[in-house]
């Protein structure tokens, strides 16, 4: 059985890990980094860049450099959070035909799973380069508070990237696995506070050890899938823009290039203020007006940053209270607090968490790598490499159906351990009703319309009967990935209808297959592009070396040969500007044939140089020998 890799598909950064024996290993990417920016860029010449190369060119290509795509995955365009992002993102968020949030890249509509697949492909390639073999299976992490549509969209991204997603695992649970697996922790209850680039989760997890087997049981989870480091960056960006406007009277929001530079500077300043009390945001030539170029130089203190984001940090505290309440625990029952996600490096976040739990968070868990390590451990559990580990996760939100009067009736309550199955019998609302619509919902509100619509389906062929008489059994079945399967059965006629919940949004099978084919075609075109570049480099080298040899040959090269070589050189030079690999190879071959006489001359010159060098060495050695005097010696016997 091949390796199942663990991938933390993050909003800001992603990370990949594998099991190496009984320990998890985080893998370095092609740039030598252990984490990869979740940034994808589509360049003018049709190339797709992922990670650091994409980040480096963002300033010159802001509209086609996509970041924080995870905030859009599985979401509707009309969602309030999407509308907020649409107003501030340099790239164009649009509504797809099915109502989902998609992105317009150079006039082409692209789905978030399709874009996220590019990051997953890089993670896959990183693992393949390390292992030296193809990788086809993965465990991918998602925020614990992701709903069904977001989980399904993440699985779709994996498929488009050529990965069979063996399991979707919640990020805080993965971090708990990373923390608890290699430590003799005994029985403990821990809180995992996960504040990443775009999402926030809190999970209360119980670790039990019985006869060498460790059980990780999630007692409760809560969160906010639109709260993270990107929001902290936005506050800093808005502050800098407002300060610059006050000072210079120019609003930088209308300048995508300036805003991209500002985004990078704001993120850098935020990070610096985790270790320093103040920093300078210094951006020369940020813009210009009739009076000339304008420079930005603004001093930002840690206190200022904290005042800008205090409400964001406070927003993370309410879910902590709810999670503890749902778990039936108090703060004193928590033995360890683990911080996950880059934004938890901010001293203010650490202080607030310590104040809430009444204890300092642990510092021995790497906030950037713990989640990928946990995903790799789960992969090891699935392959049998990791034994004696049992993971019991929960569904983050209640699941139910709409019943008479527009009410949501829950069949599975939030924080129920998964996988799970639950059935309930419902009836008709009208006399002789022959069909019912099963409207599936996810959320905690009583009014059906206030919850997340996961989709609907019809059960037809119900036997005519007075209202309230037919018995329709609705069964909800949640798998280990937290994805819902629903069936409805008329107990009288035996008619049954089943669906795996694919939200009314989401990608259909045909769209996924199309994107898989496109991804495979891209892989082929990437390979061809790489081969073309290699051939071009060989051609360039041949041009340079041939010209040098013509120069060195001088008058020894007959005029006819020289003319033929010049013609072949010119033809190769023209061919190198094109995209035809076969033509470049043909022109290189023609140049090689035209240069046969030149090669002979070059070889003769080389042989003469060698002979000359050897002669010089010999005469030098002879001269040295003339200076040598044979020593006369006689044996001196020791006197005894």
Swiss-Prot record:
Induction: By stress conditions e.g. heat shock. Residues 600-640 are annotated as: Disordered. The keyword Nucleotide-binding applies. The modification Phosphothreonine is found at residue 199. The keyword Phosphoprotein applies. Pfam families: HSP70 (PF00012). Gene3D superfamilies: 1.20.1270.10, 3.30.420.40, Actin, Chain A, domain 4 (3.90.640.10), Substrate Binding Domain Of DNAk, Chain A, domain 1 (2.60.34.10). Keywords: ATP-binding, Chaperone, Nucleotide-binding, Phosphoprotein, Stress response. SUPFAM superfamilies: Actin-like ATPase domain (SSF53067), Heat shock protein 70kD (HSP70), C-terminal subdomain (SSF100934), Heat shock protein 70kD (HSP70), peptide-binding domain (SSF100920). Residues 602-620 have a biased composition (Low complexity). GO terms for molecular function: ATP binding; ATP-dependent protein folding chaperone; unfolded protein binding. It comes from the Bacteria. Acts as a chaperone. Belongs to the heat shock protein 70 family. This is Chaperone protein DnaK. It comes from Enterobacter sp. (strain 638).
């Amino acid at each position: 059985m091949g390796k199942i890799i663990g991938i933390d598909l993050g909003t800001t950064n992603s990370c990949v890990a594998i099991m190496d024996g009984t320990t998890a290993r985080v893998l370095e990417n092609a740039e030598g980094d252990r984490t990869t920016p979740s940034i994808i860029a589509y360049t003018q010449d049709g190339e797709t860049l992922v990670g650091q190369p994409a980040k480096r060119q963002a300033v010159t290509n802001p509209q086609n450099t996509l970041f924080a795509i995870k905030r859009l995955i599985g979401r509707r365009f009309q969602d309030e959070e999407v509308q907020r992002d649409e107003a501030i993102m340099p790239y164009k968020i649009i509504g797809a035909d099915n109502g989902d949030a998609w992105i317009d890249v150079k006039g082409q509509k692209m789905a978030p799973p399709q874009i996220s697949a590019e990051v997953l492909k890089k993670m896959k390639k990183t693992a393949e380069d390390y292992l030296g073999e193809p990788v086809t299976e993965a465990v991918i992490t998602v925020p614990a508070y992701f709903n069904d549509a977001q989980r399904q969209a993440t699985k779709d991204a994996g498929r488009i990237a050529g990965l069979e997603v063996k399991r979707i695992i919640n990020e805080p649970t993965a971090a708990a696995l990373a923390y608890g697996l290699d430590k003799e922790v005994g029985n403990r209850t821990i809180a995992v506070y996960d504040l990443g680039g775009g999402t926030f989760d809190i999970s209360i997890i119980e670790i039990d050890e019985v006869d060498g087997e460790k059980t990780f049981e999630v007692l409760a989870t809560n969160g906010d899938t639109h709260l993270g480091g990107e929001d902290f960056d936005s506050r800093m960006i808005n502050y800098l823009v407002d300060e610059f406007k006050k000072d210079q009277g120019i609003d930088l929001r209308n300048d995508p290039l300036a805003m991209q530079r500002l985004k990078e500077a704001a993120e850098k300043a935020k990070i610096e203020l985790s270790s320093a009390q103040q920093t300078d945001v210094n951006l020369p030539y940020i813009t210009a007006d009739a009076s000339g170029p304008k420079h930005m130089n603004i001093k930002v203190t840690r206190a200022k940053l904290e005042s800008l984001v205090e409400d964001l940090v406070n927003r993370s505290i309410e879910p902590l209270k709810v999670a503890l309440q749902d778990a039936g625990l108090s703060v004193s029952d928590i033995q360890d607090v683990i911080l996950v996600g880059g934004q938890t490096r901010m001293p203010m976040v650490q202080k607030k968490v310590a104040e809430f739990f009444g204890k300092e968070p642990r510092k021995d868990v790497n906030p950037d790598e713990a989640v990928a390590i946990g995903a790799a451990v789960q992969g090891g559990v699935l392959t049998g490499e990791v034994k004696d580990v049992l993971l019991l996760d929960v569904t983050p939100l209640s699941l139910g159906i709409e019943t008479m009067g527009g009410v949501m009736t829950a069949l599975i309550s939030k924080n129920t351990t998964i996988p799970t199955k639950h059935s309930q019998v419902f009836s008709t609302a009208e006399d002789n009703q022959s069909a019912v619509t099963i409207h599936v919902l996810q959320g905690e509100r009583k009014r059906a319309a206030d919850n997340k619509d996961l989709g609907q389906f019809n059960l037809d062929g119900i036997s005519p009967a007075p209202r309230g008489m037919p018995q329709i059994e609705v069964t909800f079945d949640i798998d280990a990935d937290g994805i819902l399967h629903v069936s409805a059965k008329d107990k009288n006629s035996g008619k049954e209808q089943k669906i795996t919940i694919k939200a009314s949004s989401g990608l259909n099978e045909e769209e996924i297959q199309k994107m898989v084919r496109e991804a495979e075609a891209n892989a082929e075109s990437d390979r061809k592009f790489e081969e073309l570049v290699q051939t071009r480099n060989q051609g360039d080298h041949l041009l340079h070396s041939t010209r040098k040899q013509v120069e060195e040959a001088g008058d020894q090269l007959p005029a006819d040969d020289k003319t033929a070589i010049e013609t072949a050189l010119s033809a190769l030079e023209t061919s190198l500007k094109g995209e035809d690999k076969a033509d470049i190879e043909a022109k290189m071959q023609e140049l090689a044939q035209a240069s046969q006489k030149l090669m002979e001359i070059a070889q003769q010159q080389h042989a003469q140089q060698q002979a000359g060098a050897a002669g010089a060495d010999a005469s030098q050695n002879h001269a040295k020998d003339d200076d040598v005097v044979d020593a006369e010696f006689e044996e001196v016997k020791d006197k005894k």
